């Protein structure tokens, strides 16, 4: 399951709308501590500048991975948009998926009034859709706690 903050979902959708009709792409980095928590939104430039394909700029991607390494982070979410189709990985998306522990998030912007956001694990060409839980904060997400600290 992907648990992700509302502000990060809003940022993905805004990026996808801004780059439409081209596919948007980016990464959400998080601590490399086993929490699987997306934290730092990193919109990237689609080097392909295409409505049907995305490609990270190799120099930008190298800089991002060096930055994540220096910050003890990992790519928790790798996202991109589909501008005219559903939010499901294409054969190319599946072939290029190289991070077996990342959540691959797709957002469809084919409807100008709404969006579809889905998350997948892609490992060795196998696509598994996973539930997405959108939360306001990770502080109390799925703990059974309320928003009021104990006295």
Residue ranges and their predicted role:
Residues 81:
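Metallo-beta-lactamase
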């Amino acid at each position: 399951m992907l648990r992700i903050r509302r502000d990060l979902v809003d940022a993905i959708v805004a990026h996808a709308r801004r780059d439409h009709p081209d596919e948007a792409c980016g990464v959400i980095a998080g601590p490399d501590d086993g929490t699987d928590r997306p934290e730092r939104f990193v919109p990237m430039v689609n080097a392909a500048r295409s409505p049907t394909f995305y490609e990270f700029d190799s120099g930008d991607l190298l800089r991002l991975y060096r930055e994540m390494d220096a910050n003890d982070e990992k790519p928790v979410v790798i996202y991109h948009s589909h501008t005219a189709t559903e939010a499901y990985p294409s054969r190319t998306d599946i072939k290029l998926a190289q991070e077996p522990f990342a959540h691959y998030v797709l957002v469809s912007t084919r409807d100008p009034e709404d969006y579809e956001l889905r998350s997948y694990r892609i490992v060795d060409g196998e696509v598994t859709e996973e539930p997405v839980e959108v939360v306001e904060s990770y502080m109390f997400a799925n703990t059974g706690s309320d928003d009021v600290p104990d006295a």
